[in-house]
């Protein structure tokens, strides 16, 4: 059985959001929880909804999106962050990955690339199962003889 992947999307425009929403809707493993174009609003939704993944588009204001990725990587380490953008300059991709994004998705979305990213995200989320805390005592015994 495949785990359901939940997504929150930060888009730079309505066209980008519609494209991402349509591509995600084509995969049965995915459920879109929320989307928006305001970084603070999306940040609050991320904390409230705790999705398994987030797609953050890098547009004209890429610095704000990269700062959001850094912030989410620190505060939501179990969430797989995916950056996306039309501009696929190596510098921008590298900066987003260094900030904490796990993958970069080129826009417009190509079906095979999206499937690969969703497979990686699914593997990442499956490995995030919290281990139960073991309770016990540690007793150390030292010999009184040298």
Regions found by a protein language model. Give the residues of each.
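Conserved acidic segment of CheY-like receiver
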Residues: 2-24, 35
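Short hydrophobic/Thr-rich beta-strand motif most characteristic of the beta2 strand and flanking loop
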Residues: 29-37
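Conserved phosphotransfer microenvironments
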Residues: 42, 52-72
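A short, hydrophobic beta-strand element within the central beta-sheet of small alpha/beta folds
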Residues: 78-88
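The C-terminal output helix
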Residues: 120-131
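Walker A (P-loop) phosphate-binding motif
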Residues: 129-146
